[in-house]
């Protein structure tokens, strides 16, 4: 499959460990692709939940996926500052249909003031027991929480102001030329 190009729109599909579709985001504009990473942006995009419920995102969000890390990052650009929602998840794959990954329940939320919260630990434990997450998967996910927290604490990659400025400005340029 040819990698999507800058300005192309892709869908994003989140699955659970058992292979069931969890959530779909309809339109994300690709801002950059490389061998390992995808950076994109969506704004007021349609989201469909596994139970069929639909809703629309409220603000622009930059997305970051990397094939070597077991997390992805959503930077929500709001009036009061940037909030981050980080999913502990498998590295992504891309096919003709969508960018796809397995959501492993654990999430890290970062507020504009820098406060961090680890979310959905109970959901992770329940699904781990239900779907028999391997010890290796558990080890990888816990190691990636540490990498993610290091990135957050040190303003690396998507957690830097420069990253947000560069990629959100690029999104605005591309969106206004359509």
Curated annotation (Swiss-Prot):
Which branch of life, at top level? Bacteria
Name the chemical reaction catalysed here. Answer: a ribonucleoside 5'-triphosphate + H2O = a ribonucleoside 5'-diphosphate + phosphate + H(+); a ribonucleoside 5'-diphosphate + H2O = a ribonucleoside 5'-phosphate + phosphate + H(+)
Cysteines paired by S-S bonds: none
Gene Ontology molecular function: magnesium ion binding; nucleoside diphosphate phosphatase activity; ribonucleoside triphosphate phosphatase activity
Species of origin reads: Latilactobacillus sakei subsp. sakei (strain 23K) (Lactobacillus sakei subsp. sakei)
Q: Please name the Gene3D superfamilies in this protein's record.
A: FomD-like
Cofactors required:
Mg(2+)
Its ancestry begins with:
Bacteria, Bacillati, Bacillota, Bacilli, Lactobacillales
Q: What does this protein do?
A: Has nucleoside phosphatase activity towards nucleoside triphosphates and nucleoside diphosphates.
Known EC number: 3.6.1.15, 3.6.1.6
Provide this UniProt record's keywords sorted from A to Z.
Hydrolase, Magnesium, Metal-binding
Among InterPro entries, the record links this protein to:
DUF402, FomD-like_sf, Ntdp-like, SA1684
Annotated Mg(2+) 1 binding lies at 87, 103, 107
Tell me the protein's name: Nucleoside triphosphate/diphosphate phosphatase
Q: What class of enzyme is it?
A: hydrolase
Q: What positions does the entry give for Mg(2+) 2 binding?
A: 105, 107, 120, 123
- Tell me which Pfam families the record gives: DUF402
Q: Where is the active site?
A: 23
Q: Which family does it belong to?
A: Belongs to the Ntdp family.
